[in-house]
Structures are given as C-alpha cells and as structure tokens.
Amino acid sequence: MAASFPPTLGLSSAPDEIQHPHIKFSEWKFKLFRVRSFEKTPEEAQKEKKDSFEGKPSLEQSPAVLDKADGQKPVPTQPLLKAHPKFSKKFHDNEKARGKAIHQANLRHLCRICGNSFRADEHNRRYPVHGPVDGKTLGLLRKKEKRATSWPDLIAKVFRIDVKADVDSIHPTEFCHNCWSIMHRKFSSAPCEVYFPRNVTMEWHPHTPSCDICNTARRGLKRKSLQPNLQLSKKLKTVLDQARQARQHKRRAQARISSKDVMKKIANCSKIHLSTKLLAVDFPEHFVKSISCQICEHILADPVETNCKHVFCRVCILRCLKVMGSYCPSCRYPCFPTDLESPVKSFLSVLNSLMVKCPAKECNEEVSLEKYNHHISSHKESKEIFVHINKGGRPRQHLLSLTRRAQKHRLRELKLQVKAFADKEEGGDVKSVCMTLFLLALRARNEHRQADELEAIMQGKGSGLQPAVCLAIRVNTFLSCSQYHKMYRTVKAITGRQIFQPLHALRNAEKVLLPGYHHFEWQPPLKNVSSSTDVGIIDGLSGLSSSVDDYPVDTIAKRFRYDSALVSALMDMEEDILEGMRSQDLDDYLNGPFTVVVKESCDGMGDVSEKHGSGPVVPEKAVRFSFTIMKITIAHSSQNVKVFEEAKPNSELCCKPLCLMLADESDHETLTAILSPLIAEREAMKSSELMLELGGILRTFKFIFRGTGYDEKLVREVEGLEASGSVYICTLCDATRLEASQNLVFHSITRSHAENLERYEVWRSNPYHESVEELRDRVKGVSAKPFIETVPSIDALHCDIGNAAEFYKIFQLEIGEVYKNPNASKEERKRWQATLDKHLRKKMNLKPIMRMNGNFARKLMTKETVDAVCELIPSEERHEALRELMDLYLKMKPVWRSSCPAKECPESLCQYSFNSQRFAELLSTKFKYRYEGKITNYFHKTLAHVPEIIERDGSIGAWASEGNESGNKLFRRFRKMNARQSKCYEMEDVLKHHWLYTSKYLQKFMNAHNALKTSGFTMNPQASLGDPLGIEDSLESQDSMEF
C-alpha cells in the first residue's frame, strides 16, 4: 500500500511498484511512535503565518491532522519549516561555551601525564601540576642532593613533558598518584616497580564536537542491565566464570607471547648473540633466565642495567627503546638510553666465567664466555680473510705513504661499509665508530698510553691537565706567574700539545678557592661588619689614615676579612665534612647547627729582608696572624657528633694565613691599629650564626675561637702584662718568681682575659689612691689594656725551646763545676760554652747557634746528649744527677707534646705529677746553686700547670703554635719567589699564594702525585692476578706537600 506525500517533501509521484521500501518504513514509524507531522495543509500554513506575526509559537498550535474518515489511513502532513531558536547564532555560541565548560570539567578528572581517571584510585589522591613539591618529595630530593623543587621541573626531568606552557582549557591541572610514585621511584632506590600505562606521551587537544574526552564521558552512562535470572543454578555460574577466566588468561598469554615475538624481531640479534643452548652445563632454569637477555632470550652480550634493575643486551635494549618508546620492555617503567648502567662487577665476573660450547664444526672445545671471541676468531676460514691479489704493475705502497686522494681511493669500500654501519646502528656518527675502532686497535696491541689519550679526547677532556691540577703544581713548586708561563710555553712548543693550562685558566680556578667567592649570611648580621660577601684581599689598616693618634704607621699590611676567610676554609673542606657525616651514619641533609673550633696563632718574625721597590720604608720585621680549623661537630640526638678533626694540627698545610704585616711585634700602636678590626670581626662572630650552603643544602655554623698559638712574649703584649723579665713570672697564675721557686709544683690557673681588663681599669684609675708598688702588686703586673683574648695555656713548641735553653745552660755550668765554684769569671763561662759547643759538634753533629730553635732543642734533649756531656764532667755523682734530670724530663715531655696524651702516652700522663715533684726536688737540691730563689718561666709552667691544662683541654701539643712557625718559613719562601716589584702587590701575592698552599682541595692532587711517585709502580710479588701492580697496597698518603 502506497502512501501519498505532499510535494513539499520533494518526492516524485512514482508508481507503487517502484517506490523505495523506506517509504513504507517511514509510514510505519509515524504510526508506531505517534510523531507529530512536520507538514501542514496550505490553510494551516496560512494560519501559522498569521500567528507568527502575532508572536505565538507555531509548533505548539499545530496538532497532527488526520485524513477524512473514509477508511483511508492517516497521511502525515507538515507545515512550512521555520527557523528554530536552536539554529540561531546566539544559541550556537552558548552551546559552544557550554561544551568547553563540560570539556574542562572532564579534564579535572584526568591525569595530566598518563591520561588515566582519578576514579581508578580508591583514595582519590591527586597532585597539582604547577607549584612546589610536597614535603615527602622535597625530603627525598634533598637527600639525593637534587636542586629541583617544583613539579614542572620534576615532570620535565622524569617524563620529558614540558607543562610550563599548559592551558587550563586544553590540559588537566593535576596528576595521579601512580605518576607521583614513578617520580619517587626515579630518585629513590626502593625495590618496588611502578606500572606506567602508556607507551607514548599523552597528547591533549582543544575541544571539538568529536572530542574523545567528552564522547568517552558520555558513553560512560550505560543502560541498566537486566536483572540476572535468579533460577540459574550455582553450578552453571561457576562454569561460566571459569570459562571466562580461562579466555582472559589465554588472551593475556597470547598478547605476552606476541609482544615478545615483536621485541625479538626488533632486536634481530640471532646472528650476533649466543643461544642459551650453547651453555656447557645444564644450569637450573632460573639461573639461565638470570644470565639471559629478557628481550632476545640469548646469553647477555655487553649487558646493561636499567633503573628498575632489569638486565638486557645493550644492542637489544637500545633498539627496543628506539622503536617502542622510552620504557622498560619488562615492567613498562620509564627508561631512557642515558639511564643505562653497567651491572655490578660480581655479576659480570660470573657471566664471563660461564663455559660455552664452540659452535664451529669439528671443534668440541668448551671456552669461557670472556675468551669466546678470541677463540672463535681462530676458526675464520681463509676465504673470509681479505688478501690482496698482486696483479702486477707498480709495487703496492703503504697506506700512510700515499697522498690523501689515493688513501681515499684505497679505503673507499671500507668507508662505505663503516658509513652503512654507523647509519644503521649509531645514528650516523661515523667519527665515533672510527675513533672506537682505533681505540680498540691500540688496546689490542697494548699501546695503552696512546689509548688513554685518545679516550680522554673522546670524552672531551683532552690529554691536558685540569686547571686545578696545574694550579696545585704551580703553588706546590713555588713558581711565580712568569716562571709558570715559561714552563707552559716550553712544554707546548716541544710536545705540540697543551698539557698545562694557560695562566687565565689558573686564575679562574684561583677565584673559587680564595675568600670572597662564596655567598653567605649571618644571623643576626655582624655588628660593624659589612654584609657584602665578595670581599677578597683588603688593606690591613681597613681604611684608617696613615697615622693613628699622631703616631706614624710605616707599615704594609694585607689581610682577608675574618668571616669571609672562614667561609672559604669551610667550602674548601666540603668533601671532608660530608664524608665525616657519612662515616658517622648521619644523613647528608642535616643542616646543623655545626660547631667549628678554631685555633688562632700569631707570631713575629725578625730579619725579614726588604725587597727593593716602590713603597714606604718599612721595618725588616713581620707579624703573621693565622688560624686552623681544629674540629667540627654537629648536635644530633642530644649529643655532639664529631664530623671532622684535624689529623695534623701542627702542620703548615692546615694553618691558613689571615693577616700579613711588615711591622715589629713590639710596636704596640701599629699592632693594635692593624689587629683591632680583625679582633672586632672575631668578637662579632661569637654571637652570630653563619648560614652557608654546603653540599647543596643551607646549613648553620657556630664558631668557638681559642687563641693558643702565641709565644709568651706576644701573650704578654696582647694581654697587657709586663715583659718576660717581670717579677710576675707566669701568664697563667699570679705567682712571683720567688713564690714559684719556693713552691715549684702546687699552683693553679687564675688569670683570664676578663680579669686582665678589670685589673687594667684599676691600674688606669687607681681607685684606692695607692703608691706605684702597691698598685702594681694589686693588679699583678697588668700595665696596658688587653686587646686580644687568649686562652691561658702553654705553647708546647716554645716550652721545648725555653727548657732546652735552660738545659744548655745547666750543661755549661756542670762542665765548669759551678756547684763547687759559684764565683767564676765571665771569661771562664765563655770557655765552658765553647768547650760544650765543640764537643756537641763532634759527638752529636750539633752546630753552634746564636739563638735556640725547635730543631736544635729536639736534638739536644736526648739521653745521647747527656752521655756526651758527661764525658766532660769528672764527678760520677753529677753524672747520675744530670742523667736522672734528663730522664725525668723525657718522661714528662710527651704529655705536653702529644696531640692526645690520654691515647698516645697514658702511662706518662698518670706518672706526670710524681715525675714533676721529683724533678722539682732535684732542682732544689742537686742544682740548688742555680735555682735558689729563682726559676725560669717555662720550668715553672712545665712543673705547675701542665696537668690542669690537660684536664681542661685534653691536649697541649695540638694547640701549639708550631704550624704558624712553619708558616713563617713559607712566608720567606713565597716572598723570595715573587716577581712583582711593588711592595703592596708583593704582600698581596704572598698572602694569596700562601692561602692556596693550605687548600685541602689542591693538596689532594699533590698527595695523589706524591703517592704514585713513592710507590714507583713497583711490582708487588704478593699481589693477586686481579691487581698485578699492587698499586692499592703501595699507595701512601704524604704528610705534607714537598718543597
């Protein structure tokens, strides 16, 4: 039955036989759903038009029209179509905005990195893409010494995704916990593996009508499923579930097998790698799996390890990463070619020791995997060997004797093969392939020196030395700039290579090691000290005029600012501090507070020959102020943990110069003018904390200053005491010389810097209006204002020197038998001294000296010297007394000389009180002729104060001024070698050069050089095959740099 349509639909009035079948379907559809007709009769159309002018909605008032009731079926009719509000421009814009809003709302539920929905995580954990990292991640980054502190930097580093240019309407603003775990796994050594669901980077696009994100969200609303048939038996359910699970397992296994097949095809290494079937021993399956590649399932060849601890052949993993993306083929964890590392040596040794069967015909040998290549090369047939066929003509010349054009012609085939290989395997890097071939050829011929040079060039280092090494050589060998430059040019001209670095490279290396390079901060800021940190060498007068209180200051002084010098010293010790923290099982990220104990030393030098040149006339004497970092501790778990302690506190290598001046130490005004600013900086640092970035982490440091490296003359100068010949014999107690001689042993330390300041005020103001003698007795010898705080102690070096000078005098008096004849003339006394000098030179090889020094004192104070002197003394009784006196002294000496007497000489420490009392008894009986009513300053300190100082400080020898005295010799050496004529510049160069000489960073280079030189690369007969030279056993650390 045909339906008649009005002509408005555009359908032709064709016969029923040829009408398209969809017409009948349309008729049936309108009946079934009672859809209102979209067509109307002409009369209704006119009415619709009229109503539209009145503003009434037309579609609401046009009901479906039925045909006449003549038995025919109703015919759908439709009025003339009118534009719906849906098709207006305004509605279209609203729909577009609404679509974008829905799109952006959908983005909020997706991860920016992997694209997964947050609904998959039952805890709904999410993290902002932009902003700082969370606390847990920040702690991990600090522990691993990473500088990144924001999510965009971490995401770019781990996933190679730049999120800084993200737009909120296109990209999600958060990422999921799974991606957060991947980033944690990247920077931690946790054994867990994290699954990354995508093989490629997720791409995000602006919203479109066919947007995948919005369509996926719509499709998520499913129709309600039908209620399950409750009459279905449990048995049938179980069977269906088992069948479904079996199908899933089968699909997964097939997918796994297919992915393995794909990776094997990608690797395509069956011709170059060995099958596990060639193993000579039938190993367990799990062991075979552990030594085989997880891609090609062959025995590992050139194995590499990923971050997730999976092992592959290098060729296989690189090919898979190139084709399948930067993910581990085993666990899908992110992995990049730069992350690949060689496995541990123990694994490689096991792998190389595996025995494999030779696959060649008629060869039944079993060889280790390490020697397999060498063995298989012997089986090459003669047809595979390139043999030149002499076709006559001119004799064939060697390759190196040909012209460049001829060389190209002869090597053309090889060049094409190498190029093809490089294009296929190495990304077209022909240079690297050729250099590697050359390197392997050199190694095969045992030409390792050339191979090392070539390898250095390939790594971009070149065959030359680093600037820091050249600087260490220059400083250690005392070369001036001009001398080093001559050596640099000579070596470069002779060898044709730049082994040493030019001077400008050394100056750049110097800047890092000198004070004024590193940034730091004080909390609270230092009083009366500039907050700028880029302060290098400054004038010693610190901007004062050329005269102080109308006193002319004829001096040249150069110094570092104290705080800047301490910062540079700490940064120079950075590796030692961090290593000390690791050795104490402390975390690297601990920020303190660290407590730094500093030993201060100051000493005057006489007879410093003046250089000719411009500048003021200055005295031929010098004063040096220096410091040594003795110990660094950190407060941890309610106790102080020692992270650094100076092993050789009296070495010149750790005594850092702070101030140099050409002045007389007895010149009180000049000394105070130059040292007062330095002392003001020191006092300010006592009440502040240093904030310094060490090892990438901001750490806090506190300082304790101990002025112990002063001789007695300088202590009396800076503490305002009378000179050494004063009645008040001691700088530690108030005893007079008479009191000390009557009571040799029992005294205690009473003096202090604060007490000396109070006594100076009493001396200055005389509040009790006393006479000079009474006032002097009240203040116990304080006659000037103290300006440097020193620790009441004994300087071990000067104690040795003072006591040796006294024994030298006793030897002379014993030769002259003064105990019998106390009234000898001056000529006789000179004759005794000449006799002693001549005998010591003959027996002990001790040359006479004008003034006692440390070396002479050490040689003089021995039992052999006493035996030699006894040859000149006739009385046996005096022999015994003299030998006993020396024996007691040698038993006491280690207590004040050793750095830690409780460990090094505990017996001598325990017996010290007894020995000192016996020593005092001998002085007051056998040697009464000299010590009746008087005693020397250092004998008094040795007998009375040593045990108390040891109990307080733990050591006397460690706090001695010996390092500063050794530094005085270096000062003379540096001053001689310097080439600049101006005195001011000369002092700057000496200070800079001396500071670099004490750098621990530079000392490590020279210690390595000295250790190798000492070992001499000698063959150790006891060395194992793995270490034929035995270098590890023969390396020794040197005490100091060689001159």
From Swiss-Prot:
Record annotation: effect of changing R474C: Found in a patient with relatively late onset of infections and isolated T-cell lymphopenia; likely pathogenic; also found in a patient with T and B cell immunodeficiency and progressive multifocal leukoencephalopathy; decreases recombination activity; no effect on protein abundance
Crosslink feature (Glycyl lysine isopeptide (Lys-Gly) (interchain with G-Cter in ubiquitin)) location: K234
Residues where Zn(2+) 1 binds: C269, H273, C296, H298
Alphabetically ordered keywords of this record: Chromatin regulator, Disease variant, DNA recombination, DNA-binding, Endonuclease, Hydrolase, Isopeptide bond, Metal-binding, Multifunctional enzyme, Nuclease, Nucleus, SCID, Transferase, Ubl conjugation, Ubl conjugation pathway, Zinc, Zinc-finger
Gene3D superfamilies attached to this UniProt entry: 6.10.140.510, Classic Zinc Finger (3.30.160.60), Zinc/RING finger domain, C3HC4 (zinc finger) (3.30.40.10)
Residues bound to Zn(2+) 4: C358, C363, H375, H379
Site (Essential for DNA hairpin formation, participates in base-stacking interactions near the cleavage site): W896
Outcome when changing R841W: In T-CMVA; also found in a patient with an atypical form of severe combined immunodeficiency /Omenn syndrome
Region (Interaction with importin alpha-1), start-end ranges: 1-288
Ranges annotated as biased composition (Basic and acidic residues): 40-54
Region (Disordered): 40-80
Outcome reported for the amino acid change (mutating A444V): In OS; found in patients with an atypical form of severe combined immunodeficiency/Omenn syndrome
Posttranslational mods: Autoubiquitinated in the presence of CDC34/UBCH3.
Binding site for Zn(2+) 3: C308, H310, C328, C331
CC terms in the record's Gene Ontology section: DNA recombinase complex; endodeoxyribonuclease complex; nucleoplasm; nucleus
Ligand binding (a divalent metal cation): D603, D711, E965
Positions bound to Zn(2+) 2: C293, C296, C313, C316
SUPFAM superfamilies for the chain: beta-beta-alpha zinc fingers (SSF57667), RING/U-box (SSF57850)
Function according to Swiss-Prot or TrEMBL: Catalytic component of the RAG complex, a multiprotein complex that mediates the DNA cleavage phase during V(D)J recombination. V(D)J recombination assembles a diverse repertoire of immunoglobulin and T-cell receptor genes in developing B and T-lymphocytes through rearrangement of different V (variable), in some cases D (diversity), and J (joining) gene segments. In the RAG complex, RAG1 mediates the DNA-binding to the conserved recombination signal sequences (RSS) and catalyzes the DNA cleavage activities by introducing a double-strand break between the RSS and the adjacent coding segment.
Protein name: V(D)J recombination-activating protein 1
